[in-house]
């Protein structure tokens, strides 16, 4: 049976399992960044894990705070992955719908955003209620929160990346009439 598992920073075996899952999903060449993310971004409030009864890790999802100074916090969903032998079972969809989104709403996030790892995932995330976002421009004021800024400094030597809003898909948690461009020719 699959169940929600708490994140414990002191659990070295869990850290190794998360790193292995990320490496399998996104490639070994990213290992230095996965390790930096573990050091700066993962914590019990922002990390969602699914495990089997034997404690073997099945899925991982991370929430990174991004801030819009006029509109509040946004949850950047980062490194969402399910172990290959469990893909297609709906585990990540259930984790997002039943655990992540309700907690994000409860914690006062304005919405969630993400970058699909492949174009084939666009339809998958649309089924969660996400919409494609037109290319960001400098008028979009969302920037990394404190933990994300610390990570970016460690990873890249800069507190921000070239594009202040790297998200390609977005899901506001309430009605929006703001300037975020939720309509694209691909929707």
Residues covered by each model-derived region:
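Conserved N-terminal entry element of GNAT/NAT acetyltransferase domains
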Residues: 1-13, 173-187
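A conserved beta-strand-loop-helix scaffold within acyl/acetyltransferase catalytic domains
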Residues: 19, 23, 29-53, 59-81
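Short hydrophobic clusters on alpha-helical segments that form packing/core surfaces
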Residues: 77, 99-104, 121
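Conserved acetyl-CoA-binding loop-helix of GNAT-fold acetyltransferases
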Residues: 82, 88-102
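Conserved GNAT acetyl-CoA-binding A-motif
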Residues: 103-117
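Conserved beta-strand-loop-alpha-helix junction that forms the acyl-donor binding cleft
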Residues: 113-123, 138-144
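Conserved acetyl-CoA-binding loop of GNAT-fold acetyltransferases
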Residues: 126-136
